[in-house]
Amino acid sequence: ATELYRQHASNGAQLWMVPANLSSYRDVDALAQWIGNAEVVTSGGTSTLVKPALVPTLLFPFAAGRVAGSLADAGPETESQARLLLWSVERSIAALSAIGTDTNVDHRLHVILPGSPNRGTFGGDGAYGEVKSALDAIVNRWSSEKQWAQRVSLAHPRIGWVRGTGLMGGNDPLVAAVEAAGVRTWSTEEIAHELVELCTEQVRAQAAVKPVEADLTGGLGDNVDLVALRENAAKAAAGQTSEPVEASATIAALPSPATPVQSTAPNWGEFEADL
């Protein structure tokens, strides 16, 4: 973020970096309050405006940790994953879009919802598939829940395979096999360009009428058997490493060093003495 600010920020731009645990509803609410209220420091009878009250324009709720676990592992860990990936996203949209209701009547918060074609396709990724399915429901609720939707516009890209990210980095060894099956994978720079394109004035005008859907799957959801690809890649890797390896020369091990025997404390038994 700091490098992006240094290289591309325009004159007068400001960068604010605020620590927040987005799995905590309390932190989500506190962050919204911090954004929407001015920060003033008073010293010696003089008040200094440190941060003005801000009205959010764009929201990229892309915070995501590593996910793991099968359906059989459903429990507190998957609940924590869903809280970060879904419930905190909904709470953030509601809280941030409400800022400036009295002063910026026609303002809309433009939200880029990070969708995915993954509906359990990979397997073993915890609540991820269920959460991405739930983002489809948020898009549908935009048309039926005007109390928040009238101040929100949605762009819903369904993002496919992005190489080298925290979520997909572990699957990078399968990239060659996936691309051979006809699936396009994205670099982080390529997908960033596509996401920024969803923030233009034209797209935001369209999203004010109805949510904008964007297919960035690269064919990932088109009946691609990822389990079979993973198994075939594992077999190929095992075949490459199954060639006999020439044994290295060995020498007899040196004798073990002598270990001193520690003396045990004598057993004096019980005794009594007058003090």
PLM feature segments, named:
Residues 1-55, 65-72, 77-80, 252, ...:
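Short-chain dehydrogenase/reductase
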Residues 2-9, 35-43, 92-100, 138-146, ...:
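Hydrophobic, Leu/Ile/Phe/Ala-enriched alpha-helical segments that form helix-helix packing faces
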